[in-house]
Amino acid sequence: DPSRPVIDLFAAETGAVLAVAVWLLRDELRAVSPLIEKQVVRCLKERILEPYLKEHFWWMGDGVSPMNNWTIWCTQNVLMTAALWEEDEEISRAILQKAAKSADFFLAEYGDDGCCDEGPQYYRHAGLCLFNTIEIMNGMTDHSFSSLYREPKICNIAAYLSNVHACGPYYINFSDCAAVAGLCSAREYLFGKRTEQKEL
């Protein structure tokens, strides 16, 4: 139903990809036509930011229902879109508050040991999306969330990949993950840096 946009995993991710692409290429796009940016931003507001505030999707959490990586993965992507393209401070604040609540629900599901119950591959859509969420919230609030990096649970979430690393490209495998989880990126390094864990 085009009159009631649904934010699911890939709607949120597509929104974030478009938000970042247009932000990075805005000068080049404006040289072609100023209408490109306007159309993309209009769609981002209609399909992502407005329904995010107006609706409650299951992955946002309610403090009772169990959450999974959708919660923080979608939250990260909606926040990225808002951080880049929402100019109204009141709307931006409302999105931030709702996102922070979802992040709390997500964290409540994590054990104190920081283990990702979906395995090392999904950690990138769980623990690392939490890292991105904190970074975006810090960017939107002049680093109001920086103290989170000193919380033991957050530090343990950051250390998860190094704790389950077996050797070379192999990780201790469980759930529906492969033993070869793929190459690490800058996010693992930066999460380690923020939590002061040199082994990362």
Question: Residue ranges of each PLM-predicted region?
Answer:
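Active-site lining segments of carbohydrate-active enzymes
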Residues: 2-121
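Amphipathic alpha-helical protein-interaction segments enriched in hydrophobic
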Residues: 120-128
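Carbohydrate-active enzyme catalytic cores, enriched for enzymes
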Residues: 127-200
